[in-house]
């Protein structure tokens, strides 16, 4: 969720790159209705916190919803899965330089996939994989925070210098 929010905001010319970014985490977890969910929530919060510390970014705000259970009149009970939604915000120094997610028909231009994870390509769960009739279990992840930070900084240089025609994160099946 952290990488997703950051690869969404990377297309804006941030005043101080990744150091400009603050995150908000909204935890929706069924702690009140499922045994063991408190521990899973703790592990999730710790993993998010550790990753953010490794990236040198803060999470000064957030929210929790810990019930996440719906009881119907017929007695059926539906328990939502644990989820975190992360939003990113930061100071933009020139809104006119924001790179839009629309492919531009420009002769001699190229489409590149920029790797933020340093791992083998993984498309499990992406819209692209689904169009091929494949859902997959290998979903994109980030194993090296320093590599991610470096990739983020490289894209920021290209955004600031106006070198990109279009950009979109790969989480929804798009290309960076």
Give, region by region, the residue ranges found by the protein language model.
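Glycine/proline-enriched, intrinsically flexible loops and inter-domain linkers
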Residues: 1-176
């Amino acid at each position: 969720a952290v990488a997703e929010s950051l690869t969404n905001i990377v297309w804006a010319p941030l005043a101080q790159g990744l150091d400009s970014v603050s995150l908000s985490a909204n935890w929706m977890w069924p702690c009140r209705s499922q045994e063991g969910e408190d521990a899973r929530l703790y592990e999730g919060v710790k993993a998010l916190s550790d990753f953010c510390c490794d990236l040198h970014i803060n999470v000064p705000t957030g929210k929790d919803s810990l019930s996440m259970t719906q009881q119907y009149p017929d007695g059926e009970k539906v328990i939502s899965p644990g989820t975190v939604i992360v939003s990113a915000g930061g100071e933009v120094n020139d809104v006119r330089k924001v790179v839009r997610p629309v492919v531009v028909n420009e002769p001699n231009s190229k489409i590149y996939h920029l790797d933020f994870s340093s791992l083998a390509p993984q498309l499990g769960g992406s819209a692209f994989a689904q169009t091929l009739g494949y859902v997959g279990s290998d979903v994109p992840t980030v194993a090296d925070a320093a590599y991610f930070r470096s990739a983020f900084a490289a894209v920021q240089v290209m955004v600031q210098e106006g070198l990109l025609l279009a950009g979109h994160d790969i989480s929804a099946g798009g290309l960076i």
